[in-house]
């Protein structure tokens, strides 16, 4: 019961953002880690009757639909026992044959906007070790370098990824393999070897159960040394119980040797595979499940796991035979493993969270340019208020000093993939203008900005920076007016925080970077005189902006830390609307409504990857709304002959409940 509650809570959190629909399809190639039942329940290695594999959770998250095995018409081609090399029985497709089967159903082409998983290699390692021992070929087993020398299996796994990319696959997730020495099987490896050698003459199940019972009574693990000591203690207790008084030192040496060999070989396989993948071209999403499991096993409680030594199903019982109500099924605690190799339902849910965090991260990072957009918008909004003030209060040979505050606030309702959460920015503005004549004014302005952005429940950052502009404005007696401004800004984006939910743990990755922007605005209008104090007329505008956000690296050494490329964007926006203004009154209100249209609406693109890999992939962010409407209400007032004040409130609507408000308040003093 306890495990079911933890599993349900994890699913609720992950699937709360399932409206993403970021991909058109989801296809999985692999072995029993991913097999959803291509041969019925006997190939579904997962404890419990209603549990979900990591890929079934991801399918609901990204496509909002169940994930069905390929033999039943779906896109899960993974088969239990599968390998990259031709090592399994002929009835089990290799990863390459699974891809061939998939392509044969899809006219030989992969989906350019599809998300693929190729998770293969664990069975290759098992076959390779057994075959090497049978042949007395220990060269690859004893090799202590970084590369895998036992067989070409890592290269064949890479070839499977390449085959999908060559067929047009958009994104390929390539998880590595958790250390075999950390699985429950390692604790009973000696008994497993005896069972293989002696068959029915050796009652392995008795030893498995005794080992399972001994390990279940151990406490929390805080180090690898402690984990090994628990296993050695349990191993020694079982041997003593069965009249085999082998010295503890011998047991320790054996256990350490087996664990080290398994872990080293797994690490070599992962290294060779990653090295091969780094030479490919395409969107490869490397998922470091090896390091993730290292972190979980040494801090199980933090992630919500009560036991990382024994599985849900008693050691020696395969998980597809282990369902609720069976004597060998345990739901008293939350376990990391279903059986002696495969993850538990909670383990699969955590893997899904982990993979989703990697896939989504560059997409979230595309939102960083919003700070530049807001800085430009609040700066320009204040400048427009000053230019309106100058039009309302013309003069000759006046030197004007002006300043004040401006800011913006936005709160949008949607899922985390909309990238439109809460945004606030506040600016301090100061400027200088020269009024050469009633018809001509020019000057400059500088703004210091402070912003706070919560893009969604997983991504947030702060911004601090400055923007400076030069402007010129001309007004004619017949009511025509026009102005132009050019601006340059720079920002420090600090406290970039990306939250990753992993079971019960919330991990936060931190980073920081810089951003720069350049822009030009052109505005013109005509004021038709309705009365001595009221004018009205059309307004038109054009705005060009160019943004750049530098690349950055998250600063932890964890399995989730990533690095991201720089991002650039150009925007061209035309606008048209209508203005009603008052003049020569103690307080001169004005109203303006505008329609804005993006001529170029390309979205930001960002490449990213885990810090420990040379592979990378690129995600494109959300396209800006093609059209938006703004409504401005403002006023200017002459307090004295030399002192004027002005203020505006500007409401922007972009659809999808995405609304923003800009405000300005300033004063102008003439000398």
Kindly give the residue locations of the regions a language model identified.
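Outer membrane beta-barrel transmembrane domains
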Residues: 354, 445, 467-474, 564-671
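Outer membrane beta-barrel translocator domains of Type V secretion systems
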Residues: 366-530, 535-536, 650-664, 668
């Amino acid at each position: 019961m306890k495990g079911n509650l933890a599993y349900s809570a994890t699913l609720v959190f992950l699937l709360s953002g399932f409206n993403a629909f970021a991909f058109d399809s989801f296809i999985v190639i692999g072995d029993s880690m991913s097999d959803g039942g291509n041969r019925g329940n006997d190939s579904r290695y997962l404890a419990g009757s209603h549990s979900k594999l990591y890929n079934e959770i991801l399918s609901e998250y990204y496509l909002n639909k169940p994930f069905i095995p390929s033999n039943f018409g779906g896109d899960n081609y993974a088969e239990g026992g599968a390998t990259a090399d031709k090592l399994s029985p002929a009835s089990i497709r290799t990863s390459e044959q699974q891809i061939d089967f998939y392509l044969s159903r899809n006219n030989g082409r992969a989906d350019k906007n599809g998300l693929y998983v190729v998770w293969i290699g664990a069975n290759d390692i098992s076959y390779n070790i057994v075959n090497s021992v049978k042949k007395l070929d220990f060269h690859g087993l004893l090799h202590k370098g970084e590369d895998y020398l036992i067989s070409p299996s890592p290269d064949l796994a890479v070839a499977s990824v390449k085959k999908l990319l060559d067929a047009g696959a958009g994104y390929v997730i390539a998880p590595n393999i958790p250390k075999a020495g950390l699985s429950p099987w390692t604790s009973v490896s000696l008994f497993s070897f005896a069972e293989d050698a002696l068959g029915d003459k050796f009652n392995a199940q008795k030893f498995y159960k005794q080992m399972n019972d001994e390990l279940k009574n151990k406490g929390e693990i805080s180090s690898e040394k402690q984990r090994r000591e628990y296993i050695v203690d349990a191993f020694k207790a079982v041997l003593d119980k069965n009249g085999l008084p082998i010295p503890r030192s011998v047991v320790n040496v054996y256990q350490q040797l087996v664990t080290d060999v398994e872990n080293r070989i797994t690490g070599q396989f992962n290294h060779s595979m990653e090295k091969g993948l780094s030479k490919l071209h395409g969107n490869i999403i490397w998922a470091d499940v090896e390091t993730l499991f290292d972190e979980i096993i040494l801090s199980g409680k933090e992630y919500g796991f009560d036991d990382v030594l024994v599985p849900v199903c008693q050691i020696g019982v395969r998980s597809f035979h282990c369902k609720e109500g069976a004597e060998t099924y345990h739901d008293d605690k939350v376990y990391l493993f279903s059986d002696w190799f495969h993850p538990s339902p909670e383990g699969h849910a955590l893997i899904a969270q982990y993979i989703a965090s990697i896939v989504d991260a560059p997409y979230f990072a595309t939102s960083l340019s919003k700070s530049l957009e807001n800085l430009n918008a609040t700066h320009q909004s204040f400048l427009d208020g000053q230019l309106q003030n100058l039009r309302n209060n013309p003069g000759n040979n006046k030197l004007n000093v002006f300043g004040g505050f401006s800011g913006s606030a936005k709160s949008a309702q949607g899922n985390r993939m909309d990238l439109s959460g809460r945004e606030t920015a506040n600016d301090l503005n100061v400027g200088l203008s020269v009024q050469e004549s009633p018809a001509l004014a020019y000057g400059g302005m500088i703004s210091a900005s402070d912003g706070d952005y919560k893009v969604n429940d997983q991504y947030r950052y702060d911004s601090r920076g400055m923007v400076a502009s030069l402007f010129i404005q001309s007004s004619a007696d017949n009511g025509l007016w026009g102005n132009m401004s050019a601006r340059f800004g720079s920002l420090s984006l600090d406290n970039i925080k990306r939250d990753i939910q992993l079971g019960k743990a919330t991990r936060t990755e931190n980073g920081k970077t810089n951003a720069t922007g350049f822009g030009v605005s052109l505005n013109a209008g005509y004021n038709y005189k309705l009365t001595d104090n009221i004018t009205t007329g059309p307004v038109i505008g054009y705005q060009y902006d160019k943004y750049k956000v530098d690349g950055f690296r998250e600063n932890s050494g964890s399995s989730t830390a990533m690095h991201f490329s720089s991002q650039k964007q150009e925007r061209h926006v035309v606008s048209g609307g209508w203005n009603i203004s008052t003049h020569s009154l103690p307080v001169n209100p004005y109203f303006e409504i505008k329609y804005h249209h993006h001529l170029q609406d390309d979205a930001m693109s960002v490449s990213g990857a885990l810090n420990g890999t040379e592979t990378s992939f690129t995600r494109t962010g959300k396209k800006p709304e093609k059209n938006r409407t703004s409504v401005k209400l403002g006023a200017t007032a002459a307090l004295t002959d030399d002192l004027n004040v002005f203020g505006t409130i500007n409401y922007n609507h972009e659809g999808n409940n995405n609304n923003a408000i800009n405000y300005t308040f300033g004063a102008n003093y003439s000398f």
